Amino acid sequence: MQNNTILNEGKLLYTQKKYDKALAFFLGLPTDSPADKIEVSYYLGLCYTKLERYDDALLFLEQVVTSGGNFERVLQCRFLLAVIYALSGRRRLADFELNKLLETGYMTASVYAAIAFVAWEQNDTERCMSYYEQSLRKDPDNVSSLNGLGYVLAYQEKDLTRALSLCKQAVKSAPKSAACLDSLGWVYYKLGLYKDALQYLQQAEQIDTMNVEIAEHIKSVRLKSGH
């Protein structure tokens, strides 16, 4: 079997979204396999990311980034590293990776959205909104930024009309996203439209049943509405 076809089975499993099976395939490769080690690390990093095993993902994504190989692949892994760092509270590392990406011009709208998310986690609301705005100037249909800015505007009780418009657009693009449904429900809550708020928040909870924030939002609506 040629080197460039050894990994085809694992790649196919990954594209079919069978991430557990793809992971097992790549982990099961013999140590003396002639397959490209960096390519194996790349797919292991992707599989672990999809399975939300972020600490495991970091190990392999960092290997790809430090290899200095395929430029597009390195940039993709930098972006995933930044998102994982942000989610796990390692904000300085997230900032470092995101700024490196900005220097290259890679996926600019998504990078701006990620920086905005990090800023929100740091309670820097003005910087957060500024980067969401920059993201939407680059890509007016970026779902993360539509949803993120809409939620922040609602949270700050600033321009609820625009917040509603942004969140509606996000839900239209991603109707099965618990995050987008939650944000839209929260805007309706801020507008005092509790029936609509509960409708979307409950949809969000059905998709992401263990989400504490969604549960808290539903509790807030019920307290206000008397249900």
Predicted regions and their residues:
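Canonical tetratricopeptide repeat
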Residues: 8, 43, 80, 114, ...
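Short coil turns that delineate tetratricopeptide repeat
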Residues: 34-35, 69-72, 106, 140, ...
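Residue-level recognition of tetratricopeptide repeat
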Residues: 11, 46, 83, 117, ...
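Canonical positions in the second alpha-helix
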Residues: 29-30, 63-67, 100-101, 134-135, ...
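TPR alpha-solenoid repeat register
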Residues: 40, 74-77, 111, 145, ...
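Structural motif corresponding to the intra-repeat A-B loop/turn of tetratricopeptide repeats
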Residues: 16, 51, 88, 122, ...
